[in-house]
């Protein structure tokens, strides 16, 4: 498959993506099986009543999943989780409870589904893994089950959250060392961040995701998180194109070039949080001062999607540099595809206090000059 992609002319990349669209029939069958499993679990007696369960296939269900991927997350929202602190404090107990209930469902064999529940990796595991198979599914599916505080029960996904919400998240309600550990709570916001994008951009994300999987097969772990590459693709499009009909090869090349410049990356979005709240602003400035690469989660400012190990990026950057020489970045006449002009960093506004000082000085100077003129 790697040979197929790298040898395809730039003009044929769109056709290549079409051949790797999500397997819609498999998704539909998987959804039916998951719905049946969720219905059984909802009827059981958990330590706290299940509010609802949300299942998403592959890459968090964002419309960017590749054909042939058979992994999924099953997020369990429980009524007795009413805050981030609750999730952190009760996570281990809830994971054990979910494992117990899954084992009982498996023993009863009521939904025609077979699954193998794995042992917990550690007493503090944040997820429970199991494999599922069913007569309607052509392949086995690997699941991670995660209990979560239902954040979207308190937020409108279509509106910018009250910034006090983020101020509470970063000031005391998130224990030290737990930053970014609550990312599953933000799944809905994160999905919407990508779901609202143009169709062709989502297809470009699929292409980048496929490239990432090829690199992973060749290089193995550790590599930067796949979600970092997805966000990098969105960023490249936002700053380099912003049109719904663009040259796929140009977008692909731009993303790979950004990967090679990982030491310079400083990327964030202000879709859900911004610098207008003083406490949030101070925190964002601290986050953006950290060693690069920095790619802040659009929904959760406590989480640097780029990770903490630049060595992971160095390995991926080496592979990206090699790929830039392949035929997939050349036209039929042999000329090279040009990338979009995209900066490696997003500018950071002045701190709140400095901004106030600046305006006070400006205002004083204004009154001094014009007050003196009017009195004269």
UniProtKB/Swiss-Prot annotation:
Tissue-specificity statement: Highly expressed in lung, spleen and thymus. Also detected at lower levels in heart, kidney, liver, lung, skeletal muscle, testes, uterus and ovaries.
Result, substituting residue 36 to S: In strain: BID, DHA, MPR
Pfam family, one: OAS1_C
Outcome after substituting residue 347 to A: In strain: DHA, MBT/Pas, PWD/Phj
GO CC aspect terms: endoplasmic reticulum membrane
Membrane-crossing segments per the record: 352-370
Membrane topology: Single-pass type IV membrane protein
Protein purpose: Does not have 2'-5'-OAS activity, but can bind double-stranded RNA. The full-length protein displays antiviral activity against flaviviruses such as west Nile virus (WNV) via an alternative antiviral pathway independent of RNase L. The truncated form of the protein lacks antiviral activity.
Family: Belongs to the 2-5A synthase family.
Self-association and partners: Interacts with OSBPL1A and ABCF3.
Protein name per UniProt: Inactive 2'-5'-oligoadenylate synthase 1B
Organism: Mus musculus (Mouse)
